[in-house]
């Protein structure tokens, strides 16, 4: 059994398992931190960004590099459409992948790169919420990029400028493998290969293994995957949470006693408590708008954003600020709010109970009807300008601050110290994200809310699950670089532990010792057991082993006619000898049968 790691980011995982002649891909995470090396794409023309000075490395000696870089506050950025870090493509041929198992909508954004124009002919499995919300994430990304096209594409910097530049996140893999975003046509074609599954539903993969999904508690429809053969069990854990939020809670039972546990997507902010961060977030927002300032919250169109709506609206009610408007800007804003209310079966029991009252599981439906939460597809949408007034709270994408409506508000509110931008998504470093907007007077704060398993929670869970082998990213066995003394921020296990990095191949010591074989009824009728002791019978049999669609079946031998060319004049025995021979008893029975002068002699090789 082998595991091939295709990603350098544990929270945007992608790996391939080779097991029983099948290739199973776990997740297709798209690492977007590479976009931090590019200039933002403003929806409205930004004079400041347009007038940034060009930058060319003196030692480059390549005239074609001119115009590919711009400098902002001492930092250099690529002036081109942003590019994304793909999963490793040289380790495995995507055409050979049999199935792709997606854990959650955050881990599927690279799917079109894997399934389109690669010869992929397999099946993609995911839950219904993952498909619906994942499509929204992809649609939002495509819309952000396509509505702000760049007049030219910078390409020479990859070949010539890396030795002169220290762009952010260059350790994500070779920038030459970075790619611009796919199209909606690619998205639709890729998602047409998806088969929706439910929790605990078992899918057969070519008769070799079965795969099933169980709730992971991280987000709507998120799951952990269980791969089972007749005598082996592999568990893949990605994006799991033991916190009580809006998704259905994590299921532990089916994950226990695995031959191998593959663990990814632990918290990116091990020093930040989600509840504490949420409380500080609400207090800061309320204080800012009370002082007449505006609050900008870069966000995704789903996930923690729902919890922010709920907690923030409740806090503003307690502080008497119910008239402060909240704007939700995303090309998929209205669909996102609608889907969250119709996917009741995937919610926690507390949220499900509200559906049967009947009542909306989330308060944002009531907030929209009451005019407190206002969804718009864009700042250019009809009615937005007339409705917009300050002070206000704006939720907008993208959290990288490189594209989306958030770029406009960074430019608009940046000069005022009364305003604040608050980062709650842990995917992007605050300092690198705001770098092209510096210098700015607006305050930038970070209250990361990551509900993924912490290291303490993960260690406790591993002790409970008792896997034989644990396979995880190398980063999880080392303390954070900024806290080298924090030995509690690593994964420790009593079982065999193996680590992986991007491009590595891990050999998991799970040996196949048994194979399931089915016996036909006809052959079973010919079996005559002999009881060797109370409750235990043994029988010998003769049959032919047939393998079809990776299933083994034992059938009676076909009778060959005596004149057939295949017949060799011999027939297989109907019974076989077994066990140890009692020589004394054997001699006694020979004597009883009329054989006289029976003698037994001991020799070096046995008895005669």
Which ranges hold each PLM region?
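Acidic/His-rich, metal-assisted hydrolase cores and their charged scaffolds
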Residues: 1-608
């Amino acid at each position: 059994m082998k595991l091939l790691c295709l990603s350098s980011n544990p929270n945007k995982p992608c790996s391939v398992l080779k097991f029983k002649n099948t290739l199973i891909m776990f997740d297709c995470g798209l690492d977007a931190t590479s976009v931090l090396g590019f200039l933002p794409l403003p929806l409205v023309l930004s004079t400041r960004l347009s007038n940034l000075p060009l930058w060319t490395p003196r030692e480059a000696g390549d005239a074609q590099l001119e115009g590919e870089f711009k400098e902002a506050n001492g930092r250099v950025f690529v002036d081109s459409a942003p590019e994304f870090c793909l999963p490793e493509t040289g380790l495995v041929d995507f055409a050979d992948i049999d199935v792709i198992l997606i854990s959650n909508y955050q881990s599927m954004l690279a799917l079109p790169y894997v399934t389109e124009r690669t010869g992929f002919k397999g099946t993609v499995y995911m839950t219904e919420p993952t498909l619906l919300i994942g499509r929204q994430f992809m649609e939002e990304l495509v819309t952000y990029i396509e509505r702000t096209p760049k007049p030219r594409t910078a390409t020479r910097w990859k070949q010539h400028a890396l030795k002169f530049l220290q762009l952010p996140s260059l350790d994500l893999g070779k920038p030459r493998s970075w790619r611009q975003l796919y199209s909606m046509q690619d998205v639709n074609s890729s998602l047409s290969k998806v088969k929706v599954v439910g929790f605990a539903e078992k899918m057969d993969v070519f008769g070799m293994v079965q795969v099933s999904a169980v709730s992971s508690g991280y987000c709507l429809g998120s799951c952990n995957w269980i791969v089972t053969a007749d005598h082996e069990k592999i568990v893949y854990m990605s994006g799991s949470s033991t916190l009580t939020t809006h998704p259905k809670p994590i299921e532990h039972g089916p994950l226990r006693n695995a031959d191998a546990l593959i663990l990814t997507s632990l918290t990116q902010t091990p020093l930040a408590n989600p509840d504490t961060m949420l409380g500080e977030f609400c207090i800061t927002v309320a204080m800012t708008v009370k002082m007449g300032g505006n609050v900008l919250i870069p966000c995704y169109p789903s996930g923690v954003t729902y919890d922010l709506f709920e907690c923030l609206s409740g806090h503003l009610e307690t502080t008497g600020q119910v008239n402060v408007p909240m704007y939700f800007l995303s090309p998929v804003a209205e669909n996102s709010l609608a889907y969250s209310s119709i996917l009741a079966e995937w919610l926690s029991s507390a949220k499900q109970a509200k559906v049967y009252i009947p009542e909306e599981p989330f308060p944002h439906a009531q907030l929209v009807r009451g005019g407190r939460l206002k969804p718009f597809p864009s700042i250019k949408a009809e009615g937005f300008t007339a409705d917009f007034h300050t002070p206000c709270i704006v939720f907008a994408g993208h959290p990288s601050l490189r594209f989306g409506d958030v770029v406009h508000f960074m430019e608009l509110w940046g000069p005022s110290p009364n305003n604040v931008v608050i980062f709650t998504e842990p995917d992007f470093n605050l300092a690198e994200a705001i770098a092209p907007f510096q210098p700015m007077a607006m305050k930038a704060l970070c209250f990361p809310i990551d509900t993924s398993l912490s290291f303490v929670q993960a260690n406790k869970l591993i002790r409970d699950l008792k896997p034989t082998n644990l396979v995880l990213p190398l980063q999880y066995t080392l303390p954070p670089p900024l806290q080298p003394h924090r030995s509690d921020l690593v994964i420790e296990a009593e079982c065999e532990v193996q680590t992986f990095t991007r491009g590595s191949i891990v050999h998991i010591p799970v040996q196949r010792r048994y194979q399931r074989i089915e016996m036909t009824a006809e052959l079973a009728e010919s079996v005559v057991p002999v009881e060797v002791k109370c409750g235990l019978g043994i029988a010998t049999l003769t049959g032919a082993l047939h393998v079809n669609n990776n299933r083994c079946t034992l059938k009676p031998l076909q009778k060959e006619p005596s004149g057939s060319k295949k017949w060799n004049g011999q027939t297989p025995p109907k019974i076989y000898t077994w066990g140890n021979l009692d020589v004394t008893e054997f001699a006694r029975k020979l004597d009883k049968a009329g054989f006289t002068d029976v003698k037994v002699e001991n020799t070096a090789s046995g008895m005669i």
